[in-house]
Curated annotation (Swiss-Prot):
UniProt key word Protein transport: no
Top-level lineage group: Eukaryota
Alphabetically ordered keywords of this record: Repeat, Ubl conjugation pathway
Any one Gene Ontology cellular component term annotated for this protein: nucleus
Ranges for the HEAT repeats: 44-82, 127-165, 168-206, 365-403, 425-463, 510-548, 604-642, 644-682, 861-900, 976-1014, 1054-1093
Signal peptide: none
Disruption phenotype: Lethality in the pupal stage. Accumulation of neddylated Cul3 and stabilization of the Cul3 adapter protein HIB. Enhances protein degradation of Cubitus interruptus (Ci), suggesting that Cul3-RING ligase activity is enhanced in the absence of Cand1.
Protein name, per record: Cullin-associated NEDD8-dissociated protein 1
Organism: Drosophila melanogaster (Fruit fly)
Free-text function comment from the UniProt entry: Key assembly factor of SCF (SKP1-CUL1-F-box protein) E3 ubiquitin ligase complexes that promotes the exchange of the substrate-recognition F-box subunit in SCF complexes, thereby playing a key role in the cellular repertoire of SCF complexes. Acts as a F-box protein exchange factor. Probably plays a similar role in other cullin-RING E3 ubiquitin ligase complexes.
Amino acid sequence: MASHQYHQIANLLEKMTSTDKDFRFMATNDLMTELQKDSIILDDESEKKVVRMVLKLLEDKNGEVQNLAVKCLGPLVNKVKEIQVETIVDSLCANMMSNTEQLRDISSIGLKTVIAELPQSSNSLAPNVCQRITGKLSTAIEKEDVSVKLESLDILADLLSRFGEFLVPFHSTILKALMPQLASSRQAVRKRTIVALSFLLIQANSNAYNGVIDHLLDGLENPPNPAAIRTYIQCLASICRQAGHRLCNHIDRSMLLLSQYSQRDDDELREFCLQACEAFVMRCPDAINPHIPMILELCLNYITYDPNYNYETDDGDTGNAMDTEDDEYVDSEEYSDDDDMSWKVRRAAAKCLEVLISTRQELVEDFYRSLSPALIARFKEREENVKSDIFHAYVALLKNTRLTDDVANDHDSMDQVSGPTSLLIEQLPLIVKAIQPLMREKSMKTRQDCFLLLRELLNSLPGALGPYLDSIVPGISYSLNDKSSTSNMKIESLGFLYSLLQGHPPHVFHPHIPLLVPLVVTSVFDPFYKIATEALLVLQQLVKVIRPLEPNAAKSDFDAPSFVGQVYSCTLQKLKVTDVDQEVKERAIACMGQIIANMGDMLQNELAVCLPIFMERLKNEVTRLSSVKALTLIAASSLRIDLTPILHDVLPALGTFLRKNHRALKLHSLDLINKIVINYSSNFEANLLQTAIVEIPPLISDSDLHVAQYSLTLLSTVARRQPQALVGIHEQFLRSVLILVRSPLLQGSALNCTLELFQALVQTQLSGLDYHSLVSKLMAPVLGGNGDVKSRATAGAPSEVVQLHKQAYHSSAKCIAALTQQCPQVATPLATKLITDLQKRNDTEIIFCLLTIGEIGRHFDLSSIQVLPQTIIECFGATSEDVKAAASHALGAVSVGSLQTYLPLILHEIEVQPKRQYLLLHSLKEVISSLSVSPSGLAQLLPSVPSIWDQLFKHCECSEEGSRNVVAECLGKLVLVNPDELLPQLQQALRSESATMRTVVVSSVKFTISDQPQPIDVLLKQNIGEFLFALRDPEPQVRRVALVAFNSAVHNKPSLVRDLLPTLLPWLYSETKVKSELIREVEMGPFKHTVDDGLDIRKAAFECMYTLLEQGLDRVDVMQFLDHVQAGLCDHYDIKMLTYLMTARLAILCPDKVLLRLDQFIQQLRDTCTHKVKANSVKQEYEKQDELKRSALRAVSALSQIPKANKNQQLVDFLKSIKETPELNKIFEYIQKDSITGSSDIIVMDQS
């Protein structure tokens, strides 16, 4: 293989010496192909020959050959040894000094290629190359030849950006060459010098950095000439963008000079001053704070700076502007002047304002007062690009005004956020008035910006544009009718119209329907498929507006029938056409489904034409899913559309879909069958339905509980609506259901659907589905032949006992209790039999019997069974922990059904049985939890609350932590029952001198907070601060539970703590720090082990911070928040894992702020990814490090998605380093692939 390669390379080298340029070209091209192969291996001699030949071809007379030779350098440097790379670099550097311009140019391109391809791994190649190039480039920069100087500066900038850390020893040499170039007479030289200098200062030591900054600031204080002022200000801005965090110490001096120079009568200088301000605001957020008012004033002055144009002629009434001729809107361009540079000043001011708004969320209210009116007034800006930047600045303001759902829905907290929102509402008429004429400008960009702003306005103030539709709709019409509108313009217009229709009640659009319908219909027939697709989506929404069916839709005398024919015929034409784009087909199907669902009663004669088309589309694989979704809309419609013509074909087809390996199709098919059975069961025979439901048994599996849940719901519906369809097939699906009941994964909504199914089945009174048969089948896997309720022989159930997961016992018990609810007469006999036989059974049988008794007792009064309580309590003494837990659960559950009998017993036992206290407290918790969820349960529980409360308080300081935790939960749940009386008692207990008592009391508050509205909420909001102020408690255990309670409040009901955040956050941040007083050494034989008692508190603090990301970030100083996240990146393994998650989330929630700290984040993530575990470490250490790497790389992946992150050199270099490290690259590729995998298709199930 190798000899073949050598021979092939030798042949290529020989052809490269040919006099025929075509031979040379083809040989060079073939060489490049060979070099790109991973398998190529060159010996030393071949390397030398190839390098020598490629370098020779750089001097070829033919330009195409030269270009190919340059391209060969990239793969070549990764295939040859270091000495050959040095030869290449030396040769290219020498050629850069050549007298031949073409050779100089091709050599500089070659050097850039080599630098771009050098690996960033830890070998010596890159440092050696940097060492060889740097001196020569520094010398070249000092040459008089401008072209050499420019190329050298370019290459040096590349070198510094990629390998800055290797060039630190040469900084003094480089600076010596660069600094004089800032005074060059050539602007191009000065600009490239600034770029190189900015990259250099990223890695420079403090002395070098401060030296350069001082040089620039001294130069600004005593400038040699006007050009130097511009250069130094540009340089400051550029340095700030690259290494801004280090400029903070010089901000005050810099801003003083900028404020002076910004007043000079020099437009270019003003522009540079504003750009520098933008960089300072972005990169030095804390240091720039005192100067924000000055920057704001500067921007407001210069955003209106237009000395060569008089706007007064445009300041008249714009209200009637929509009625004027189009020519009125071309005036602004006529005043453009090639010599007028003032637009650059205005643009710089607008961009600076956008950054200011984006990074200063805490000033939003002030911005609405001072900045918003000024921006609105500048919407009339004559220069298109400046106007666009002004719009984007206002969009940034709107984005910062968005309300979280929690705050928007919480009336108690609206006063906290109504400032910006109310100011925006006040200014809404001004915004619409300013935008109205712009929506008919000829400039596409301006119109698109109008729609962008209006759409963001909808996000900030949902439903607020209703009163202004008279001003907005004609603008939409203009863009859709304008023949000069581009496709993007039309798509943007339709997209905004869709958002508008979605975000407002239907009745507000009724006056505009005569204009909107023809507009949208015309767009549906647009030849460009993307416009047609978008138009069909809008038309579907328009159907819901023309004829709303929602129960809460306002009554209207709107004449809907007059538009039905037009909408239907338009959609039908699109539905019939087959040779169109897939998206158009799908949208046409969806639109027609909506039309029939909302207007089908007005289209009786057309249904015979339209419905068969759906049947045809069901047969086509690519339109199948869309058709099922559309038919589901129709079947669920309150109009009860007559589907008889197609039902006999649809149901068998849906049955075949259930066999397909297509999850979304299965889910939607099950949902459609369910809707058909609910609304049309009288329209077809049971045997037709059987063709579909016979396919259900394989779908009832714990491998996909969501599909299983839909299947169970459908069977329940069939059992209630058309039970005859189950005859002959119930054994198959029942077998699957019984296997599912034994699954450890069955819980929540899937378990509830299973219970409903059993109740529906027993009501059918079909053979084999009677109570005794079903109960026997459920008991058989546990009790075998001993569990027969009647004659087990007739039930046909297997008698062998199966080893089950403990969750399966709970599920089976609940199923038996659900069946018993339908046959109440057997409840007491069954419970009696189970309790009587308890002594004869093994542990697993006892667990199952106890759980079953408990679940039956939850629904029935079992107090007539005399031996029941004592038998259950005796099980508390069992050796098996699982038996004890089941007994505890059973005692609590049977107490729910007969509270007066069993609650006094539990309270008495807690008093006299200290060894069984933990189990009895769990029984009590079961009672409180079960009865406090319904009004009838609360009525039962309320009289007993005082006695329960007193008993619980006696055990707040018991020695066992587990018991204290249960006491805390019970106290919290009891407070919800009677908050007015019990919450003050908790507050009183908070003043206890006992740290244990305080811990239990603070912990109990967590259980008073739920994500649903509760009567206690108002009271809790007034008093929760007293409990959370326990974050200052001297005892670590109290602070930890206070953090947990704080976390619960932020997660479930942020409005409770929103006002307290300024006070609580400093205490929270304090708990994220490592505290030396909580670290101790423990001797374990000859070894000393360090124990950090503060770790659990720090974990609780970081968990609380993570929750704040989702719920309270609008009230948090993000930059301060980031400080503590970054500190956590260097903490213990558990903390690191949390902060990696937070980093990834922050990259999505506040990308602009994270971008400012990207360098620091990348450095810490790089340290984790490159960390090596010690050779003699245990396996667990390797696993931990692998998990850290995976989590760190997930954070890197999220950071890399931030807009403009690809301009951060540290990130770019790190990503390249990851790709060059096989181990990291494999993980990273998997993460990226995983992140773009679409989530499965979830649909909302209507179980009515």
